[in-house]
């Protein structure tokens, strides 16, 4: 594989990157970790005339807690999130999901914001961001705006990002002491894209589940929040009958497409299997705390 010819510019500010995006339009691509872009260049699936290297933008770096939120800079690598003590303490859902992202070599280079911006429907971070009520800070270098993760993913590889905007950070509200998380996915091999995956959150107190978030990935063009299944489980003890009702609701909420490895009916069945596993993990975490 050989990439097509391209010009290269390295920038150190969001404003500079946005200005180049406005100047060059569809002919420009941002590059940070490059774990998706480099592959598409090599296969000639993408032939931009300009690559804009944004790795040196300081305001897009780092992981911090302030003002009741966990802030993850868009340029934080997957491995940074995986190893972060702040993430493990305040938002363990991300710590649970990180080891499932591809392989170590990719996690060492790929970026948190890059994965979210690419919006692969089988990727882990988009679903986790929705399940944890994340909000994205988008900037064109002059103005910034905040978009809830639930409103950011519009369709297959489509997002609310404007052509001259960058994701600079993702903010997560710090969860309360009763918030519990679970993450599970099924893949043919570790590191492969998930056939079906689930990010799960809920308040658990004395065996009672409140305010659940059930977000699937790999079953649609975007992360899919299973609201009817949530309603079947909310304000209950997640007993077998309630869990059966929640699994039954998935048939009306998920419309997975079959592929070479699993038929649509198989994926729907697996979604129910993951929900049972995830709820069991969620409730077990409360029993151990």
Across the structure, where does each feature detected by a protein language model lie?
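C-terminal structural segment of proteins
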Residues: 1-289
């Amino acid at each position: 594989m050989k990439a097509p010819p391209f010009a290269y510019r390295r920038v150190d500010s969001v404003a500079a990157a946005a200005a180049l995006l406005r100047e060059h339009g569809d002919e420009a691509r941002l590059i940070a970790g490059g774990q998706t872009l480099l592959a598409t260049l090599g296969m000639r699936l993408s032939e931009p005339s300009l690559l804009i290297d944004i790795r040196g933008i300081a305001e897009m770096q780092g992981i911090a807690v302030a003002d009741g939120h966990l802030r993850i800079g868009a340029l934080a690598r997957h491995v940074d999130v995986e190893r972060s003590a702040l993430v493990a303490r305040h938002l363990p859902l991300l710590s649970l999901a990180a080891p499932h992202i591809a392989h170590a070599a990719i996690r060492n280079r790929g970026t948190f914001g890059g994965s979210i911006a690419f919006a692969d429907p089988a990727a882990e971070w988009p679903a986790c961001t929705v399940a944890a009520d994340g909000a994205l800070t988008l900037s064109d270098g002059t103005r910034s705006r905040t978009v809830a993760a639930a409103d950011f993913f519009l369709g297959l590889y489509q997002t609310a990002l404007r052509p001259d905007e960058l994701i600079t950070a993702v903010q997560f509200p710090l969860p309360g002491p009763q918030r519990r998380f679970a993450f599970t996915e099924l893949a043919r091999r570790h590191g492969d894209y998930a056939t079906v995956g689930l990010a799960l959150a809920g308040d658990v107190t004395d065996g009672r589940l409140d305010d659940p978030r059930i977000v699937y990935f790999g079953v649609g063009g975007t992360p899919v929040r299973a609201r009817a299944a949530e309603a079947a489980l909310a304000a209950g003890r997640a007993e077998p009958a309630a869990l059966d009702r929640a699994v039954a609701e998935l048939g009306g909420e998920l419309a997975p497409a079959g592929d070479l490895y699993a038929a649509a009916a198989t994926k729907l069945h697996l979604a129910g299997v993951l929900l049972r596993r995830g709820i069991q993990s969620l409730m077990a975490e409360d029993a151990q705390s």
